[in-house]
């Protein structure tokens, strides 16, 4: 009798631990001198509104004029915030880097209520596990996340986003910074034209 066929198995946690040679692609678009940083929580309705305007802002401003840096602002009252932020960071380590991370954010934004809790404390997601959230995001985004999510020291990138926000005194989402200064006069309710008017000429 011939040998049993080899079954491709997922790497063990020890194998993943031995290979932590990973890099999170910075969530940066454009390369202009004006730096527009936006701190977003992926399931926050106001963050979702702001996220939906970033492409239009970059198109209108031009990649030669503006650099957009997306910062992840996890918030504990959005109950699966930590899991979803880790999914976004995990996506950024994949071959397509920030494009995969953006696809994950767009998928969550498009189905935001399926990743939230009713009044932050109830609803169907009480029965959902972190693995269920990962699979749901994979289904909507087409991005395979589970293996990258399991990178043991992936939290160092998640912590960087947290520390960066804290050192800048940022606690809410969305928050906007232009050239290193918080702009309290900017909000998700503004039009792209309003944002453009607040950028340096």
Task: Provide a role label for each language-model segment.
Residues 23-32:
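Short beta-strand-to-loop junctions in surface cap/lid or active-site-entrance loops
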Residues 37-42, 48-131:
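Structural alpha/beta surface segment adjacent to cysteine/selenocysteine redox centers
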């Amino acid at each position: 009798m011939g040998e049993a066929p080899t079954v491709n198995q997922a790497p063990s946690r020890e194998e993943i631990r031995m290979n932590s040679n990973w890099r999170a692609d910075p969530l940066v678009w454009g390369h202009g001198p004006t730096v527009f940083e936006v701190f977003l929580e992926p399931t926050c309705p106001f963050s979702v509104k702001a996220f939906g305007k970033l492409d239009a802002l970059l198109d209108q401003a031009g990649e030669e004029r503006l650099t957009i840096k997306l910062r992840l602002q996890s918030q504990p009252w959005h109950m699966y915030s930590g899991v979803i932020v880790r999914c976004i960071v995990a996506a950024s380590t994949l071959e397509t880097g920030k494009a995969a991370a953006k696809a994950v954010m767009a998928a969550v934004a498009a189905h935001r209520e399926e990743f939230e809790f009713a009044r932050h404390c109830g609803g169907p997601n009480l029965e959902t596990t972190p693995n269920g959230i990962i699979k749901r995001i994979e289904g909507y985004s087409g991005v395979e996340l589970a293996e990258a999510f399991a990178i043991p020291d992936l939290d160092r990138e998640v912590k960087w986003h947290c520390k960066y926000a804290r050192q800048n005194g940022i606690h809410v989402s969305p928050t906007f910074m232009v050239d290193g200064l918080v702009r309290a006069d900017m909000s998700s309710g503004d039009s792209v034209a309003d944002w453009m008017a607040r950028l340096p000429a």
